[in-house]
């Protein structure tokens, strides 16, 4: 390596970055400096995220009209993608952005059953390019080996073009983790109530960690994910965390604080006259009360205690970074929810002691919650083939053999409609795909190669009804 070559300079930068990353004091100083600078633009950031969010929402009614893709197949794909993200050590925002790209594409194009995994990995590839470091972005060979040679390298490039064209090159979308960070910083920098700000600041790490865990869990449940926006999911996750971890903050007051942000003059100063992005509140009190009920808490216990296998690997691995803390948080949350559902009977003497403690610590009782019969279904279980698994050794192996498969018919272009407008897939024109890009994918030595684990790629992510 030449001393003045770009590679030499890159190695020096990598070495300096590793030295800085190992210096905890330097990291703390940089974080405080970053927080102080960002604090000045928090309202502008909130307005921008809410404005972009309204333009990048998927359409559930169109996704349900998919002829081959069912909502029951979705958790299998997301579980597979989360496992890939965990093994490749990608950023936290990569997963929610990948899910957003998949759902938005399914809202505009018909997706074949055998192309569902291809769509998921390509969306993950696009998200990596936007959010992760260059050296973490998987190559085409890596993608091919991750899916156990189910697709050719050229098909990922072809699918990437279709996704970008279908989404009109609008890739970035606000994710729930971005809102969680912003909500936490807004509350910590709240000058009107220093007591609450100090309480949140002391528990900010636990609040962010457990809120992100709940937000990732909600991605697997369509009736939560599609009924609420990313900003609302982030707020619901924070409220659940404050409730279950027994942080002494009133939930209604916390909800009113966030809803009041969009009514301040500082926030409204960012809204142009005549603009469509007028926001009255983030999550209404009625929506909050209708969601936080006994039925929801019962299912929330099941969701928290029984996460998908990929989230178990990410948060509860034996040598994981947050495994001990997450186990403590999950145990505390489950016990709190069980106490809410079945409160422990107490004696009159114990009640008088509790009242004395509440008066001494200025405890504010939580408001009563309405009860209805809405329920959250458990994660669907597949009786058929699950997504092809892989290991890190497979990704970087030198074997370049690829089994021959048929690409099939590509998803057609949809007619242009306004966002949220219901339409039928019967009015979609078929997209003609040139045979030059597909005919060249045949293998010369097809007879000498063996197929990988799955003998029929058409059954990937298929749930028997």
From Swiss-Prot:
<dbReference type="InterPro" id="IPR036915">
    <property type="entry name" value="Cyclin-like_sf"/>
</dbReference>
<dbReference type="GO" id="GO:0004672">
    <property type="term" value="F:protein kinase activity"/>
</dbReference>
<comment type="similarity">
    <text>Belongs to the cyclin family.</text>
</comment>
<dbReference type="GO" id="GO:0044010">
    <property type="term" value="P:single-species biofilm formation"/>
</dbReference>
<feature type="domain" description="Cyclin N-terminal">
    <location>
        <begin position="44"/>
        <end position="171"/>
    </location>
</feature>
<dbReference type="GO" id="GO:0030447">
    <property type="term" value="P:filamentous growth"/>
</dbReference>
<dbReference type="Pfam" id="PF00134">
    <property type="entry name" value="Cyclin_N"/>
</dbReference>
<keyword id="KW-0195">Cyclin</keyword>
<dbReference type="GO" id="GO:0044182">
    <property type="term" value="P:filamentous growth of a population of unicellular organisms"/>
</dbReference>
<dbReference type="InterPro" id="IPR048258">
    <property type="entry name" value="Cyclins_cyclin-box"/>
</dbReference>
<dbReference type="InterPro" id="IPR006671">
    <property type="entry name" value="Cyclin_N"/>
</dbReference>
<keyword id="KW-0597">Phosphoprotein</keyword>
<dbReference type="GO" id="GO:0030448">
    <property type="term" value="P:hyphal growth"/>
</dbReference>
<keyword id="KW-0131">Cell cycle</keyword>
<dbReference type="GO" id="GO:0000082">
    <property type="term" value="P:G1/S transition of mitotic cell cycle"/>
</dbReference>
<comment type="subunit">
    <text>Interacts with CDC28 and SLA1.</text>
</comment>
<dbReference type="GO" id="GO:0060258">
    <property type="term" value="P:negative regulation of filamentous growth"/>
</dbReference>
<comment type="function">
    <text>G1/S-specific cyclin essential for the control of the cell cycle at the G1/S (start) transition. CLN3 may be an upstream activator of the G1 cyclins which directly catalyze start. Required for budding and for cell cycle progression and morphogenesis in environment-induced hyphae. Degradation is mediated by GRR1. Through binding to CDC28, controls the phosphorylation of SLA1 which regulates cortical actin patch dynamics.</text>
</comment>
<dbReference type="GO" id="GO:0051726">
    <property type="term" value="P:regulation of cell cycle"/>
</dbReference>
<protein>
    <recommendedName>
        <fullName>G1/S-specific cyclin CLN3</fullName>
    </recommendedName>
</protein>
<dbReference type="InterPro" id="IPR039361">
    <property type="entry name" value="Cyclin"/>
</dbReference>
<dbReference type="GO" id="GO:0005737">
    <property type="term" value="C:cytoplasm"/>
</dbReference>
<dbReference type="GO" id="GO:0007114">
    <property type="term" value="P:cell budding"/>
</dbReference>
<dbReference type="InterPro" id="IPR014399">
    <property type="entry name" value="Cyclin_CLN"/>
</dbReference>
<dbReference type="GO" id="GO:0005634">
    <property type="term" value="C:nucleus"/>
</dbReference>
<dbReference type="InterPro" id="IPR013763">
    <property type="entry name" value="Cyclin-like_dom"/>
</dbReference>
<dbReference type="GO" id="GO:0016538">
    <property type="term" value="F:cyclin-dependent protein serine/threonine kinase regulator activity"/>
</dbReference>
<dbReference type="GO" id="GO:2000045">
    <property type="term" value="P:regulation of G1/S transition of mitotic cell cycle"/>
</dbReference>
<keyword id="KW-0498">Mitosis</keyword>
<dbReference type="GO" id="GO:0000307">
    <property type="term" value="C:cyclin-dependent protein kinase holoenzyme complex"/>
</dbReference>
<keyword id="KW-0132">Cell division</keyword>
<dbReference type="GO" id="GO:1900429">
    <property type="term" value="P:negative regulation of filamentous growth of a population of unicellular organisms"/>
</dbReference>
């Amino acid at each position: 390596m030449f001393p003045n070559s770009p590679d030499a300079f890159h190695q020096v930068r990598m070495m300096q970055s590793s030295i800085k990353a190992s210096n905890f004091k330097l990291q703390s100083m940089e974080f405080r400096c970053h927080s102080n600078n960002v604090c000045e633009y928090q309202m502008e950031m909130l307005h921008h995220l809410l404005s972009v969010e309204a333009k990048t929402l998927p359409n559930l009614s169109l996704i349900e009209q998919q002829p081959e893709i069912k909502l029951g197949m979705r958790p299998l794909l997301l579980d597979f993608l989360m496992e890939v993200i965990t093994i490749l050590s990608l950023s936290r925002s990569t997963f929610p952005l990948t899910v957003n790209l998949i759902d938005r594409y399914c809202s505009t194009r018909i997706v074949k059953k055998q192309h569902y995994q291809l769509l998921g990995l390509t969306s993950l590839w696009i998200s990596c390019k936007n959010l992760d470091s260059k050296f973490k972005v998987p190559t085409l060979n890596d993608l091919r080996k991750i899916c156990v040679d189910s697709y050719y390298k050229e098909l990922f490039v072809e699918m990437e073009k279709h996704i970008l064209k279908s989404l009109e090159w609008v890739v970035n979308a606000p994710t729930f983790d971005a809102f969680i960070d912003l909500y936490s910083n807004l509350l910590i920098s709240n000058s009107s109530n220093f007591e609450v700000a100090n309480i949140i600041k002391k528990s900010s790490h636990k609040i962010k960690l457990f809120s992100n865990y709940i937000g990732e869990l909600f991605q697997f449940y369509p009736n939560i994910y599609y009924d609420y926006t990313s900003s609302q999911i982030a707020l619901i996750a924070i409220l659940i965390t404050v409730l279950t971890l027994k942080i002494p903050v009133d939930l209604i007051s916390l909800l009113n604080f966030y809803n009041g942000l969009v009514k301040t003059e500082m926030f409204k100063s960012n809204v142009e006259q005549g603009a469509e992005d007028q926001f009255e509140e983030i999550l209404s009190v009625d929506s909050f009360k209708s969601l936080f009920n006994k039925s929801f808490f019962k299912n929330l216990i099941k969701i928290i205690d029984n996460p998908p296998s990929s989230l178990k690997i990410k948060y509860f691995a034996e040598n994981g970074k947050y495994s001990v803390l997450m186990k403590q948080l999950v145990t505390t949350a489950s016990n709190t929810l069980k106490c809410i559902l079945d409160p422990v009977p107490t004696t009159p003497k114990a009640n008088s002691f509790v009242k004395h403690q509440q008066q001494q610590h200025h405890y504010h009782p939580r408001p009563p919650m309405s009860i209805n019969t809405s329920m959250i279904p458990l994660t669907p279980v597949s009786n058929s083939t699950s997504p092809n698994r892989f290991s890190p050794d497979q990704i970087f192996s030198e074997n370049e053999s690829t089994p021959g498969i048929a690409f099939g018919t590509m998803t057609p272009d949809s007619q242009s409609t306004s966002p949220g407008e219901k339409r039928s897939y019967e009015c979609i024109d078929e997209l003609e795909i040139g045979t030059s890009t597909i005919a060249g994918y045949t293998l010369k030595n097809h007879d000498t190669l063996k197929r990988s684990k799955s003998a029929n790629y058409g059954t990937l992510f298929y749930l028997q009804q």
